[in-house]
């Protein structure tokens, strides 16, 4: 009798363990992990929060630093090779802009004060190049300034460089590892430091004004636009100007989501992003795509959903 009771207890224990394991597997399969550069994470967090209200059964989370099980990867248009096993199937949801900056009140800011640098002069300031155009007078003051650029794979360094026809390996100065926020940290420590960054890292997203410790380096734009590229600019004014037309001295690049496996949950999330999530782009410092390109992205996801039915 005791043996029979013991056998029943063991069988019950095995069954309960299997149920728990099954539930655990089911729960983990409902989580999708998204990897993103830090400047885009506040937008991703907003998306995840809002999407969970419409689809509570599917959970999206921001991936941690060294995490391997990634379902979605936020990438830039210039990242044209497969990374971390992800395909080049990319759905673009917006654009980001990169501006030249220095620390407010620094010696570098004083050197650059009142200057309106065009593309050729910006190349001279930021890059190692002895083959500058002959019509560009060499500015000796630039030589004492220290350029800080990023070396991280998610840095906007390559976007800034490509806008001037340069490679990221051709920057003068020092390379900073880690997130691009460390570029502004470097400026705070070096009075001669000069760098660049994406708008969400330059502006306070709540006040919509430039962060008090930073200063935008003057660029050569039409007089009517000068205030939009000054330290008195608001984030929304600047975004509006950049959406109206390209400014040669400002790097603007598409940002999108690359995915490894496009299951129903991922595709439905992407469809929501393109139809509802993009309304938060401006709030978090990103530009919207033009209407034609935005529609192309919506159609792309719709076609994938249709093909899977």
Predicted regions, residues:
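Bacterial Sec-dependent N-terminal signal peptides
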Residues: 1-31
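Flexible loop residues that form catalytic
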Residues: 9, 78, 199-200
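Exported/periplasmic ABC-transporter solute-binding proteins
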Residues: 20-55, 63-67, 89, 101-309
């Amino acid at each position: 009798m005791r043996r029979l009771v013991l056998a029943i207890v063991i069988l019950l224990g095995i069954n309960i363990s299997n149920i728990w394991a099954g539930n655990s597997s089911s729960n983990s399969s409902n989580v999708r992990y998204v990897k993103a550069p830090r400047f885009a994470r506040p937008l991703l967090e907003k998306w995840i929060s809002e999407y969970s209200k419409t689809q509570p059964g599917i959970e999206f989370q921001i991936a941690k630093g060294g995490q391997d099980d990634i379902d979605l990867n936020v990438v830039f248009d210039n990242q044209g090779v497969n990374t971390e096993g992800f395909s080049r199937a990319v759905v673009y949801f917006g654009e980001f802009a990169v501006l030249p900056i220095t620390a407010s009140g620094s010696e570098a800011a004083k050197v650059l004060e009142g200057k309106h640098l065009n593309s050729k002069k910006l190349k001279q300031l930021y890059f190692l190049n002895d083959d500058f155009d002959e019509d560009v007078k060499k500015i000796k003051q630039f030589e004492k300034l220290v350029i800080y650029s990023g070396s991280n794979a998610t840095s906007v360094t390559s976007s800034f460089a490509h806008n001037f026809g340069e490679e990221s390996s051709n920057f003068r100065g020092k390379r900073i590892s880690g997130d691009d926020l460390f570029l502004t940290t470097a400026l705070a420590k070096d009075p001669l430091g000069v760098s660049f960054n994406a708008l969400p890292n330059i502006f306070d997203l709540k006040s919509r004004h430039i962060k008090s410790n930073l200063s935008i380096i003057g660029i050569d734009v039409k007089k009517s636009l000068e205030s939009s590229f000054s330290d008195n600019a608001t984030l929304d004014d600047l975004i509006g100007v950049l959406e109206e037309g390209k400014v040669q001295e400002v790097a603007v690049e598409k940002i999108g989501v690359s995915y490894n496996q496009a299951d129903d949950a991922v595709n439905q999330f992407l469809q929501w992003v393109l139809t509802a999530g993009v309304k938060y782009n401006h709030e978090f410092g990103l530009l919207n795509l033009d209407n034609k390109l935005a529609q192309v992205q919506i159609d792309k996801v719709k076609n994938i959903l249709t093909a899977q039915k």
